[in-house]
Amino acid sequence: MTSHTLNELIAEGVRGRYILVRSDLNVPLDGSTVTDDGRIKASLPVLAKLTDAGARVLVTAHLGRPKGAPEDKYSLRPAVDRLAELAGFKVTLAADTVGDSAREAAASLQDGEALVLENVRFDARETSKDDAERGAFADELVALTGANGAYVDDAFGAVHRKHASVYDVASRLPSYQGDLVHTEVEVLRKLTADTQRPYVVVLGGSKVSDKLAVIDNLIGKADTILVGGGMLFTFLAAAGHKVAASLLEQDQIGVVQDYLKRAADAGTEFVIPTDVVVAEKFAADAAHETVAADAIEASSFGANGIGLDIGPDSAAAFADRIKGARTVFWNGPMGVFEFEAFSAGTRAIAQALTETEAFTVVGGGDSAAAVRTLGFADDQFGHISTGGGASLEYLEGKELPGLSILDR
């Protein structure tokens, strides 16, 4: 089946109707300051379309991982303040999610205005494994919309969660796919069906264990998988090399060895760095040097050395692979990009993506934060996903509850 779209909803007429929108406002904060407003900006078009059409918009969202109760540090206030600065319509924040404040604020909402309900994860029922508990919370959210409400899912970063505001609400209201979710799905389909080749995947980040399922599904589909980040050291260990004090998942070495064998049989090439930047300690000002990837313990720091970035030769080789591709998907930084001394590998990958003629997708999460932190603009890439975990699970071939419920 095909999901109904936002344009279909607007064509039906939304003036004066309460439209419940699940947005993605899960942004990084430094105290009360939003440090990356990419997801807020991405949520604006749908909210603007609805308010322009006269809808009374109720926004649900989460921030962080509160433990089922209100915590000031996880309030949506900073995100909503930024949203209000960017929006061309009135935006307010309710003091709670489904309590008296939310009900009163919703009742006083006017056509063309938006009300953001406080963090849905302040209510333990949002993420409950119990269907009845989640359903009860969803019923309270739906009650805010009155007799002629509708639901729009525009939070791609949450579609892999079977949560009340994502899944259960959609089963209780006429439901529609937001433009952001629609775009994300269309982009990711290009990575899984009729993909333009050569198809190069760049995988980084800390742990192999976080990427096992996506690696498994990419074998035989991707032409080349470039490996960086902390996970590269488990690949080096699988090839029989010592990695000193670098991050190593000992229990995944056998799994990686199996992947390498299967990939060779399936025609997928794994490319592992030939040089790495090794540091004396994990710190921004740590002494460091570049060494061959198969001789990490030969660095000045011996067995205490910690690999914190791919080396310049590897970065150049990876860039060449990217520039020769037709499709590129990147998920995970190549090193500790937050430290300037260990950001060169990640910067090189980002730069290569901006220079290739390939269709490029930056897979959300740390990768999206990295390109922005390093000074790249979103429009320099084909697409920057708003969903890190959701993007990976889509590429793993998993059914995503928040999408499947829209297709019912």
Curated annotation (Swiss-Prot):
Q: Which residues make up the binding site for substrate?
A: D24, L25, N26, R39, H62, L63, G64, R65, R121, R161
A molecular function (GO) held by this record is:
ATP binding
* Pathway named in the protein's UniProt entry: Carbohydrate degradation; glycolysis; pyruvate from D-glyceraldehyde 3-phosphate: step 2/5
Q: Quote the subcellular location field of this record.
A: Cytoplasm
Which Enzyme Commission numbers does its entry carry? 2.7.2.3
Listed binding positions for ATP are K211, G307, E338, G364, G365, D366, S367
One GO cellular component term noted in the UniProt record for this chain: cytosol
InterPro entries given in the database record: Phosphoglycerate_kinase (IPR001576), Phosphoglycerate_kinase_N (IPR015824), Phosphoglycerate_kinase_sf (IPR036043)
Please verify whether the record's keywords include Disulfide bond. Answer: no
Listed A to Z, the keywords are: ATP-binding, Cytoplasm, Glycolysis, Kinase, Nucleotide-binding, Transferase
Task: Name where it mostly resides.
Answer: cytoplasm
Reaction catalysed by this enzyme:
(2R)-3-phosphoglycerate + ATP = (2R)-3-phospho-glyceroyl phosphate + ADP
GO BP annotations listed: gluconeogenesis; glycolytic process
The source's superkingdom equals Bacteria
Asked if the Swiss-Prot or TrEMBL record annotates the protein with the keyword Metal-binding, the reply is no
Judged by the first EC level, this protein's enzyme class is: transferase
Identify the PANTHER family for this entry: PHOSPHOGLYCERATE KINASE, PHOSPHOGLYCERATE KINASE 1, CHLOROPLASTIC-RELATED
According to the record's subunit comment, the protein's assembly and interactions are: Monomer.
> Which family is it part of?
Belongs to the phosphoglycerate kinase family.
Q: Indicate what this protein is called per its UniProt record.
A: Phosphoglycerate kinase
